[in-house]
């Protein structure tokens, strides 16, 4: 039997990258999946909804639409996020870029938790997975200051909620991927190959993660197999955060 049979799972940012792979893995494990994206173009889902997750009223309406279709909500994967190329050093990044990144990367998680967690509580609990990043626990000279700050906020928010709701049946964890081979990252690094090379050299495994590897971690956190895990910084970074120097060869 699949690990998510009988569970209703909401995935934001479901149309591409980690979100799309997570939709596929959740479906393979028996979940009913609601795919949420800026446009209703999520593939392979049971219900596709268009929602600007940085808009509070839109998020509230999204959850109402889900409950109109399903009796419960069991898993929230708050995964939507942006990393615009204009986001760079604090000396260069415009305030408008900062604000846009915080709106999409932080406010969206706040809104989805604010309006989603009550539905989990109503039916006895569930799992909330918020996509943070390895940059929430490490610094980088190749700065993306708005993105880094936003993911630090998601990490702190997740830890707080994980503790707050621990005895009410709702687990909340921050999923912290390392660099992932997604359209978003590939587009960013195509514009700046030097930035890509400077990051790749620090990865002990010598490669970026594949989106399905992050999706598998989300699947674990969504399932009852992770029933004693909450308020965690769940790193899936190929050893990056634990490395000082990296192997020269595969010997």
Region annotations inferred by a language model:
Residues 87, 219, 230-251:
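Short C-terminal tail/terminal secondary-structure segment
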């Amino acid at each position: 039997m699949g690990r998510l049979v009988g569970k209703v799972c909401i995935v934001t940012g479901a149309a591409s990258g980690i979100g799309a792979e997570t939709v596929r893995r959740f479906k393979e494990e028996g979940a009913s999946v609601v795919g949420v994206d800026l446009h209703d173009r999520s593939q392979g889902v049971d219900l596709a909804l268009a929602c600007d997750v940085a808009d509070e009223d839109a998020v509230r309406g999204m959850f109402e639409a889900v409950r109109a279709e399903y009796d419960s909500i069991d898993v929230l994967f708050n995964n939507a996020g942006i990393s615009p190329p204009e986001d760079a050093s604090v000396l260069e990044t415009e305030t408008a870029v900062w604000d846009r990144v915080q709106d999409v990367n932080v406010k969206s998680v706040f809104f989805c938790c604010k309006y989603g967690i009550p539905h989990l509580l109503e039916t006895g609990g569930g799992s909330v997975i918020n996509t943070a990043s390895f940059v929430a626990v490490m610094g980088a000279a190749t700065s993306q200051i708005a993105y880094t700050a936003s993911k630090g906020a998601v990490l702190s928010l997740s830890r707080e909620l994980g503790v707050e709701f621990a005895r009410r049946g709702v687990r909340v964890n921050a999923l912290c991927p390392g660099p992932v081979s997604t359209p978003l990252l590939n587009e960013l690094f195509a514009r700046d190959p030097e930035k890509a090379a400077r990051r790749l050299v620090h990865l002990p495994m010598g490669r970026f993660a594949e989106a399905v590897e992050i999706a598998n971690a989300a699947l674990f956190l969504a399932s009852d197999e992770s029933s004693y895990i909450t308020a965690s910084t769940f790193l899936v970074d190929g050893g990056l955060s634990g490395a000082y120097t990296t192997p020269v060869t595969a010997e």
